[in-house]
């Protein structure tokens, strides 16, 4: 056998196949530590403020029948006509990833007869929503929102409550540089005369074909056109605020008066038109100039008639959606961070195999007592393990090695006071449960 043949007989080492690293789809953000803690803190702050105002949590599907949004949001809107993720499921049904929250909440209220009980029905929800938009700073294809809906009562005091609640949500995370813009879109009886005047005005403008189509379907949608050249042409357009009925005007004046009483500042923006067709009467938006062109951080309004349009009772409602992603960007623009608190109360450092076995039990007992606890894994030394305690933001570190095991003790380090004490191993769980409870109570 030749040398060449011998080489060929030798088993060849299999080459490890190199896979291309995957990334998230375009326009879909990841939230990983430490940003994920800030994301959760903002979402929790918004939700807690709503719970404190009597709103109950509701959990809804990520996708719905497409017809829900076509009927509820409006077929002439950009959301329905251009931005929805719509597909046929395996049964041939057209379904859509939810682009907004109100229509789904209303569907659930009708389906589960929540409107047959105590009114108003006050609900809060949170989670991801989906719109196929051109990704840019502050505008994602998967956006995160917290929203509330108050359904069943046509009362301007409820409008004021909802707006003040949204204002409180942003204040609760330390945001300062936001503004509230407010208007009234009138009721359905106010619309026909105004619609005709607006269409007459639009007919005098050199509109492109798509905008002409929109002007015929729903002329208010034209006012939502953000192109600078369109905004210039629309400068002299008739205003809905000038065409309100007496009852709609009284409703709006009551809302603004209540906001004045509550100390909630606002600017009346008569040209505001939100991108959803169901809004009536009170309509509002919170903006932050630190976000540039995508300045909206949340908004909402009243939607009288939506429930009937979706097959339910003819009950009114009002709500808002606040952007968690946008709020984080607004905090960043103010050079602030959402307050996240510490990850754990106690961090265990075990030096040696037997110490690790004992530390696993101590950490589990602490968790059983309601104390948040973690420990060092792998074979890091004391210095490396203590870095883990610092990164976790722990109040206390427990150090357990051969010396402590032999003496039946454990070293408890108070990381805030920079003090340490030897504590009986059998008593350490009880001691730390008491200490962390006291620290939490006085935080």
UniProtKB/Swiss-Prot annotation:
Question: What GO molecular function annotation could you give as one example from this UniProt entry?
Answer: ATP binding
Q: Which Gene3D superfamilies match?
A: Anticodon-binding domain (3.40.50.800), Bira Bifunctional Protein, Domain 2 (3.30.930.10)
Name of the molecule in the record:
Histidine--tRNA ligase
Q: Where is the composition biased (Basic and acidic residues)?
A: 1-20
List the residue ranges of the region (Disordered).
1-21
Q: Which GO terms describe its biological process?
A: histidyl-tRNA aminoacylation
Quaternary form? Answer: Homodimer.
Gene name of the record: hisS
Question: Cross-referenced Pfam families, in alphabetical order?
Answer: HGTP_anticodon (PF03129), tRNA-synt_His (PF13393)
What InterPro entries does the record point to?
aa-tRNA-synth_II, aa-tRNA-synth_II/BPL/LPL, Anticodon-bd, Anticodon-bd_dom_sf, His-tRNA-ligase, HisRS-like_core, HisRS/HisZ, HisRS_anticodon
Localization (cell): Cytoplasm
Q: Which organism is it from?
A: Corynebacterium jeikeium (strain K411)
Mostly located where? cytoplasm
Write the lineage as a comma-separated list: Bacteria, Bacillati, Actinomycetota, Actinomycetes, Mycobacteriales
EC numbers listed for it are 6.1.1.21
GO cellular component term, pick one: cytoplasm
Reading the lineage from the top rank, the first entry is Bacteria
Similarity remark: Belongs to the class-II aminoacyl-tRNA synthetase family.
């Amino acid at each position: 056998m030749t040398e060449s043949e011998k080489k060929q007989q030798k088993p060849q080492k299999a080459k490890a196949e190199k896979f291309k690293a995957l990334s998230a789809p375009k326009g879909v953000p990841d939230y990983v530590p430490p940003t994920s803690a800030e994301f959760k803190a903002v979402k929790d702050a918004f939700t807690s403020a709503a719970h404190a105002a009597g709103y109950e949590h509701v959990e809804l599907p990520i996708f719905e029948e497409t017809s829900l949004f076509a009927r509820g949001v409006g077929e002439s809107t950009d959301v329905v006509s251009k931005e929805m993720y719509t597909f046929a499921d395996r049964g041939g049904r057209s379904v859509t990833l939810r682009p907004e929250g109100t229509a789904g909440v209303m569907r659930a209220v009708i389906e589960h007869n929540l409107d047959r009980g105590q009114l108003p029905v006050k609900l809060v929800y949170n989670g991801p929503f989906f719109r196929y938009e051109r990704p840019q700073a502050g505008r994602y294809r998967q956006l995160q929102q917290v929203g509330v809906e108050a359904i069943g009562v046509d009362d301007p005091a409820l409008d004021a409550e909802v707006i003040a609640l949204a204002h409180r949500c942003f204040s609760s995370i330390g945001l300062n540089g936001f503004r509230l813009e407010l208007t009234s879109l009138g009721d359905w009886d106010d619309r026909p005369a105004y619609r005709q005047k607006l269409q007459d005005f639009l007919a005098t403008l050199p509109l492109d074909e798509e905008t002409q189509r929109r002007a015929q379907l729903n002329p208010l949608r034209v006012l939502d056109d953000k192109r600078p050249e369109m905004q210039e042409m629309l400068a002299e357009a008739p205003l809905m605020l000038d065409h309100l009925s007496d009852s709609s005007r009284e409703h709006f004046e009551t809302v603004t008066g209540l906001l004045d009483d509550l100390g909630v500042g606002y600017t009346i923006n008569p040209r505001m038109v939100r991108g959803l067709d169901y809004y009536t009467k009170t309509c509002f938006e919170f903006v932050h100039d630190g976000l540039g062109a995508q300045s909206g951080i949340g908004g909402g309004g009243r939607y009288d008639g939506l429930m009937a349009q979706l097959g339910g009772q003819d009950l009114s409602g009002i709500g808002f959606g606040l952007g968690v992603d946008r709020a984080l960007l607004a905090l960043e623009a103010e050079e602030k961070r959402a307050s996240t608190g510490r990850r754990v109360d106690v961090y265990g450092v075990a030096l040696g195999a037997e110490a690790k076995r004992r530390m696993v039990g101590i950490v589990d007992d602490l968790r059983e007592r309601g104390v948040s606890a973690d420990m060092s894994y792998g074979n890091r030394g004391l210095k490396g393990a203590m870095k883990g305690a610092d990164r976790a933001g722990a109040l206390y570190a427990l150090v357990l090695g051969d010396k402590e095991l032999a003496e039946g003790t454990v070293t408890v380090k108070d990381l805030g006071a920079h003090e340490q004490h030897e504590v009986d191993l059998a008593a350490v769980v009880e001691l730390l449960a008491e200490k962390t409870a006291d620290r939490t109570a006085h935080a």
